[in-house]
From Swiss-Prot:
It is found in: Membrane. It comes from Arabidopsis thaliana. This is Hyperosmolality-gated Ca2+ permeable channel 4.1. The chain crosses the membrane at residues 42-62, 109-129, 155-175, 412-432, 463-483, 506-526, 569-589, 676-696, 729-749. Keywords: Calcium, Ion channel, Ion transport, Membrane, Transmembrane, Transmembrane helix, Transport. The gene is OSCA4.1.
Length: 817
C-alpha cells in the first residue's frame, strides 16, 4: 500500500475491480494546485461531520423526543426536561439506574474535566509555540500546529518536556479525584448514603473461600470449626452451596429427555391411527407418490428393526436415562449432592471480615515450608483462595461448581482465538489489504493505472475527503463499535466467569486490547494488520544498516500522517458516534416491535406506563421492584424465553443470576471511552488540537449518556451500590494510558531530542516516579467501617447468599402430578 497519500487513506475497494481499459488520468496541468491546503483535508471532514451532527440532532428533536416522552414536548417542557437531566445528581442516577450507571457518568465527567484542563494549556501555550516558534520546512498548515514543526534538537523541546510533566501531574491528581469520588459508590448509593434500604449489602461482612473439596457439602463440621476457633464469637453464618453448575446441566438434560420421551410416545401412538393416505383415490400421480412413500417407510422400519434401532428400544433407553437423571436430581432435593467447592463465611462485623481476608492472604504468602495438620490437608487448606465476597446479585449461581481445569481450557481457547485474530486479522482493513495484494498478483497493471486515478481523486477536496477519510473512519467505527464488541462479549460469556462483574472485566480487557491495537498502534504505524507491523519491525534486527524503522516512525511526515489519522478518527467519533448514541436506535426499534406484539395472545396483562418524568418523581414513588420475582425458577428454561407480558422498563431476570440483564453494554462503552482517552493522551504533545477534540468528546458523551440513562435505559431492579471491581479495572487502564503517553514521548525525545539525550532520560525518570506514586487501593472507604458496626443492623430476614444458593425445584412438576 502506497503511504505517500493521505494518512487516513485506506486500501481502496474500487481499485480491486479496475482493469487495463482505464483511460489515462487528467494531466498534471489540469490538477488544481493547493500549496497551503490542510493536510488530509481535515476541514472537509469537519464539515461533513458537522452536517451529520446536525442531521442526528434534528432527528432527535423532531422524532426521538416523541418516542421517549409519548408526545412532542413544547419548548418550555423540552427545556425543563433537559434542565432536569443536567441537574440530576449522582444519587438519583444510582437510585433509578443503578450504581454502574452512576460510576460510568462519574468517570466520563471526570475525564472531561481532566482533558479540559490539559486542553486549555495545550491550546493556549503549546499550539502557539508549535505554530509560530517552529522553523521546520513543512508543506501544509496543519502540520505546522504539531511538534514536527520544531526542528530536531531545538531548545524549544524543553518546553514540551515541561508540558509532559504538567500533563502527568494533572492526570495523576485527576484520576485520584475520580477514584475518591467513586469510593462512595461501593455498596452505597451515589453519595455514600446508607439511608437507602436498597443500598444495604451483606457483602461487606462476607468472605468467599474457593478451592474446597467438593465432598464438603455433606460434612462441613471441620470447616466450620476451623473458622470458629480462629475467630471465636465473630462468625455469623456459613453458606456452602451445592454444585449448581452440575445441577443446571442436569436440569437441562432432564427436561430434554422428558421432551423426547413425550414426542416419541406421541409418534408411536400415531401409528395406531388410520393412514392419512387411505382417503386418496386409486388413480393419479398423487396416489402413486403416496404408495411409494408408504413402501419406503415400511422398508425403513424393517431395516431399523433388524439392526435394533426400533422406537421401542429407543424409548427404553430414554426411560432408563430419565430414571438415572431423576435419581441424581433426588440427591440435590435431599441435600446429599456434592458441594461446589466454594463457601461463603459471614462475620458479625466488617472489621473481622477484613481481618480474615488479610490473615489468609498473609498465610498464603508465607506458605512455603509450612506443615499442615491432617484436618487441614483433608480440607485442602493449601489450595484455598480467600477473598472478599462479591454481591449475591453479582454471582452467576449456575456457574458454581465448574472445575478449575474446565475454566482454564475455556480461557485458553478464547485467548488463543483472540491472539490469532489480533495478529493476522487485527483490523477489518487487513482483509482489504489482502484483496489488494491478491489483485496485484493477478493484474498489477490495472492497479497501477487505478493508482494514478486515486492520486487525482485525493486532490479533489470534498470527494477525496469523503472517500479517503470519512468513509474509512465510518467503516472502522461501525466494525469496532458494533461487530467486534458483540463477538468479544460472546467470547467472554463462553469463559463462564463466576460473577457478572468478572465477565464485564474480561470483556473490557479484550475490547481495550483490540481497540488499542487497531485504533492506536496500527493507525500510528499506518498499517492494516499487526502481522505486517511485526514483520517490518523484525527487519530492523535482520538488516540493521538498511532499516532505521524507529527513526522513520518519528520522521515529520510519518508523525504528521499519524497525528492527522488520529484527529480524523476523533472528529468522526465525536460528532457522528455520539450523535448516533443520542438517537439510541436499537432500544427504539425494540420498543416499536414490542408495540406491534401488544395484541399477541401471550400478552395477558395490559401495557404499563413507561414514562418516567424525572421532575415528577417523588421519593416515595415505587421505582424499585424486587430483584427476584416469585416465579423466577418456575422453569429451568426461563432464561431462554423472555416473557411477552414483561414491562419494557424492567429488565428480564434470568435463572443464571438474580441481577437484571443489562441492555447498556458498560464494558463496550468503557472500552471505547478508554481508547479515546488513550488516543487523546498519546497525541496531546504531538498534536495539541487533538486534546480539545477529546475533551469535547467526553463532555458531549456525558450529556448524551445522562439523558439516555434517565429516559431510555432507565430501569427498575438495579442495586444502588456495588463492590466497584469494574471501575477499579477502568482506573487501572486510565493510569496505563498515562504510561503509554510517557513511553511515546520517551521514544520521541530519544530520536528528536537534544544530542545529550537529557530529555529522554528525564522523561524516563518521570515515568519511574509516576509508577512509584502511591495509589489508594483499599476497596473500603473508612466512612463505611464507621457507619456499619454489626451485621444485625443490615439483615432483616433471610440472608441473600443463602436464599440464592438454595435451588428451587418448583419447576419439576413431572413428579408433582
Amino acid at each position: 500500500m502506497n503511504r505517500n497519500f493521505s494518512p487516513a487513506a485506506m486500501p481502496p475497494i474500487s481499485s480491486m475491480t479496475i482493469d487495463n481499459s482505464f483511460s489515462p488520468p487528467p494531466s498534471s496541468g489540469d490538477l488544481p494546485e493547493i500549496p497551503d491546503a490542510w493536510y488530509g483535508n481535515i476541514q472537509y471532514l469537519l464539515n461533513i461531520s458537522v452536517i451529520g451532527l446536525l442531521c442526528c440532532v434534528s432527528i432527535f428533536l423532531f422524532v426521538k423526543l416523541r418516542s421517549d416522552h409519548r408526545r412532542m414536548p413544547g419548548p418550555s417542557a423540552l427545556f425543563s426536561k433537559l434542565l432536569a437531566v443536567w441537574k440530576a445528581t449522582c444519587r438519583e442516577i444510582a437510585r433509578h439506574c443503578g450504581a454502574d450507571a452512576a460510576q460510568f457518568l462519574l468517570i466520563e465527567g471526570g475525564s472531561f474535566v481532566l482533558l479540559f484542563s490539559i486542553a486549555v494549556l495545550a491550546v493556549s501555550v503549546m499550539l502557539p509555540l508549535n505554530l509560530y516558534a517552529g522553523t521546520a520546512l513543512l508543506s501544509d498548515e496543519l502540520s505546522k500546529t504539531m511538534i514536527t514543526h520544531i526542528q530536531k534538537g531545538s531548545a524549544l523541546l524543553w518546553l514540551h518536556f515541561v508540558f509532559v510533566v504538567i500533563v502527568v501531574v494533572i492526570s495523576h491528581f485527576g484520576i485520584a479525584a475520580i477514584e475518591a469520588r467513586l469510593k462512595f459508590t461501593r455498596f452505597r448509593d451515589g453519595n455514600g448514603n446508607i439511608s437507602d434500604p436498597n443500598a444495604n449489602s451483606t457483602a461487606v461482612f462476607t468472605i468467599m473461600v474457593q478451592g474446597l473439596p467438593k465432598n464438603l457439602g455433606s460434612d462441613r463440621v471441620e470447616f466450620e470449626d476451623c473458622f470458629r476457633l480462629k475467630y471465636p464469637g465473630k462468625v455469623y453464618k456459613f453458606i456452602v452451596p451445592m454444585d449448581l453448575c452440575a445441577l443446571d446441566d442436569l436440569a437441562t438434560e432432564l427436561v430434554r429427555v422428558r421432551d423426547e420421551i413425550t414426542w416419541l410416545v406421541a409418534k408411536m401412538d400415531s401409528r395406531l391411527l388410520p393412514d392419512e393416505y387411505e382417503n386418496v383415490g386409486d388413480n393419479g400421480l398423487v396416489f402413486c407418490v403416496c404408495s411409494l412413500w408408504v413402501r419406503v417407510k415400511v422398508l425403513w422400519s424393517q431395516i431399523t428393526e433388524r439392526f435394533g434401532f426400533t422406537d421401542d428400544e429407543k424409548l427404553r433407553k430414554l426411560q432408563e436415562l430419565r430414571a438415572d437423571l431423576e435419581s441424581q436430581l433426588a440427591a440435590y432435593k435431599e441435600g446429599r449432592a456434592q458441594g461446589a467447592g466454594v463457601a461463603f463465611v459471614m462475620f458479625k462485623d466488617v472489621y473481622t471480615a477484613n481481618k480474615a481476608v488479610q490473615d489468609f492472604r498473609n498465610e498464603r504468602s508465607r506458605r512455603t515450608g509450612k506443615f499442615f495438620s491432617v484436618t487441614e490437608l483433608r480440607l485442602q487448606r493449601n489450595q484455598w483462595k480467600v477473598d472478599r465476597a462479591p454481591l449475591a446479585t453479582d454471582i452467576y449461581w449456575n456457574h458454581l461448581g465448574l472445575t478449575k481445569v474446565a475454566l482454564i481450557v475455556r480461557r485458553v481457547i478464547v485467548n488463543t482465538i483472540l491472539l490469532l485474530i489480533l495478529v493476522f486479522f487485527s483490523s477489518p482493513l487487513a482483509l482489504i489489504s489482502a484483496l489488494v495484494s491478491a489483485g496485484r498478483i493477478f493484474n498489477a497493471e490495472a492497479l497501477d493505472s487505478a493508482q494514478y486515478w486515486l492520486t487525482w481523486v485525493q486532490t479533489s477536496g470534498w470527494i477525496g475527503s469523503l472517500i479517503f477519510q470519512f468513509l474509512p473512519n465510518v467503516f472502522i467505527f461501525v466494525s469496532m463499535y458494533i461487530v467486534i464488541p458483540s463477538a468479544l462479549s460472546y467470547l467472554s460469556k463462553f469463559e463462564r466467569h463466576l460473577t457478572v462483574s468478572g465477565e464485564q472485566r474480561a470483556a473490557l480487557l479484550k475490547m481495550v486490547c483490540f481497540f488499542l491495537v487497531n485504533l492506536i498502534i496500527l493507525k500510528a504505524l499506518v498499517e492494516s494488520s499487526l502481522e505486517s507491523a511485526l514483520l517490518k519491525m523484525s527487519r530492523c534486527y535482520l538488516d540493521g544498516e538498511d532499516c532505521k524503522r524507529i527513526e522513520e516512525y518519528m520522521s515529520p511526515s510519518f508523525l504528521s500522517r499519524s497525528c492527522v489519522s488520529a484527529l480524523a478518527f476523533l472528529i468522526t467519533s465525536t460528532f457522528l458516534g455520539i450523535s448516533f448514541d443520542l438517537l439510541a436506535p436499537i432500544p427504539w426499534i425494540k420498543k416499536k416491535i414490542q408495540k406491534f406484539r401488544k395484541n399477541d395472545m401471550l400478552q395477558l396483562v395490559p401495557e404499563q406506563n413507561e414514562e418516567y418524568a424525572l421532575e415528577n418523581q417523588e421519593p416515595s414513588s415505587n421505582l424499585e421492584t424486587p430483584l427476584l420475582p416469585e416465579n423466577m425458577f418456575e422453569s429451568p428454561r426461563f432464561g431462554d424465553i423472555e416473557p411477552m407480558s414483561q414491562d419494557l422498563s424492567e429488565y428480564p431476570i434470568s435463572r443464571t443470576s438474580p441481577i437484571p440483564k443489562q441492555k447498556f453494554d458498560f464494558a463496550q462503552y468503557y472500552a471505547f471511552n478508554l481508547t479515546i482517552f488513550a488516543l487523546t493522551m498519546i497525541y496531546s504533545s504531538f498534536a495539541p488540537l487533538v486534546v480539545p477534540v477529546g475533551a469535547v468528546y467526553f463532555g458531549y458523551r456525558y450529556i448524551v449518556d445522562k439523558y439516555n440513562f434517565l429516559y431510555v435505559y432507565r430501569v427498575r431492579g438495579f442495586p444502588a451500590g456495588n463492590e466497584g471491581k469494574l471501575m477499579d479495572t477502568v482506573l487501572c487502564i486510565m493510569r496505563f494510558c498515562v504510561d503509554l503517553y510517557l513511553v511515546s514521548m520517551l521514544l520521541f525525545f530519544s530520536v528528536k531530542g537534544d544530542s545529550t539525550k537529557l530529555q529522554a532520560i528525564f522523561t524516563l525518570g518521570v515515568l519511574v516516579m509516576y509508577k512509584l506514586l502511591p495509589s489508594d487501593t483499599d476497596r473500603y472507604h473508612p466512612a463505611l467501617l464507621r457507619s456499619i458496626q454489626t451485621v444485625d443492623s443490615i439483615i432483616d430476614g433471610p440472608v441473600d447468599y443463602e436464599a440464592y444458593s438454595h435451588p428451587n425445584f418448583d419447576w419439576d412438576t413431572y413428579n408433582n402430578r
